[in-house]
Amino acid sequence: MLNSFKLSLQYILPKLWLTRLAGWGASKRAGWLTKLVIDLFVKYYKVDMTEAQKPDTASYRTFNDFFVRPLRDDVRPLNTDPNILVMPADGVISQLGRIEEDKILQAKGHNYSLEALLAGNYLMADKFRNGTFVTTYLSPRDYHRVHMPCNGILREMIYVPGDLFSVNYLTAQNVPNLFARNERVICLFDTEFGPMAQILVGATIVGSIETVWAGTITPPREGIIKRWTWPEGEHEGSVALLKGQEMGRFKLGSTVINLFAPGKVNLIASLASLSVTKIGQPLATSTETFVAPEVEPAPLPAEEIKAEHDASPLVDNKKDDT
């Protein structure tokens, strides 16, 4: 009965209005009130503040500052084996496995369309048919920055407007086509393991979705699909990210979906639905063997990533193929 009531609220409540209100409140500096809200949040969700660079909740000026808090460098060691792709986010695996032609598993008894997830882009969908997917759910207590599973060259980004359903276990089990209905940002990369898509899915109360190369993608929510492209390789204007480097963030929790081309990676055998994920830990192995360079570049430190994020031009300065 309680679950039925919660599901009914998902359809009845003004999710966009609530999300805008939450985003507005989370960005305000309110002194002692901000600290009180953060303290209550930490206690209720059992957030481990010992992992944060700033464990003192009084050091955060806004709730958003707290929510995208950086972690200490030593708490998420990166697996540097060049044949291993690593987990992109802290959270729990919702589902993972093979993409069956155009079908991706959402929950037991529920599939959704690969092409619908990619906003009808059949050319992009063709890259991943019969490939591999991993869906990672970030709960409110988790670290909410998203990192790269491997080195990648950004080729395309698509903003897809949509609903703002919650993306927790209950809704994943009961709301059809959940991830293909919700607002999302699709990022396509060229990698040593073939094309890879990393998709940031919005949800109720998710105030914004950001990337390190473009800043805030949403809001504003204009209600139209927008597309940007970048050059390949080392051409001027290209965006290259390293394995383990931050690529985006959520302000309040949501979901990350990774898509891999067929025959390119094998998921770690011990992973299953509800497996806990930690950034930098093994997610998949290559079907080919790569040899590490003599000196492998390390991910940028948090301070340099922040400076790069702040200095990056807005997406409006990129090639917009809307």
UniProtKB/Swiss-Prot annotation:
It comes from Salmonella typhi. This is Phosphatidylserine decarboxylase proenzyme. One of its GO terms (molecular function) is phosphatidylserine decarboxylase activity. Its main location: membrane. Keywords: Cell membrane, Decarboxylase, Lipid biosynthesis, Lipid metabolism, Lyase, Membrane, Phospholipid biosynthesis, Phospholipid metabolism, Pyruvate, Zymogen. Residues 297-322 are annotated as: Disordered. Catalyzes the formation of phosphatidylethanolamine (PtdEtn) from phosphatidylserine (PtdSer). Belongs to the phosphatidylserine decarboxylase family. PSD-B subfamily. Prokaryotic type I sub-subfamily. The keyword Iron does not apply. Its EC number is 4.1.1.65. It is an enzyme of class 4 (lyase). The lineage of its organism: Bacteria, Pseudomonadati, Pseudomonadota, Gammaproteobacteria, Enterobacterales. GO terms for cellular component: plasma membrane. The active site is at 90 (charge relay system), 147 (charge relay system), 254 (charge relay system), 254 (schiff-base intermediate with substrate). The modification Pyruvic acid (Ser) is found at residue 254. Residues 303-322 have a biased composition (Basic and acidic residues). InterPro entries: PS_Dcarbxylase, PSD-B, PSD_type1_pro. NCBIfam families: PS_decarb (TIGR00163). Binds 1 pyruvoyl group covalently per subunit. Pathway: Phospholipid metabolism; phosphatidylethanolamine biosynthesis; phosphatidylethanolamine from CDP-diacylglycerol: step 2/2. It holds the Pfam family PS_Dcarbxylase.
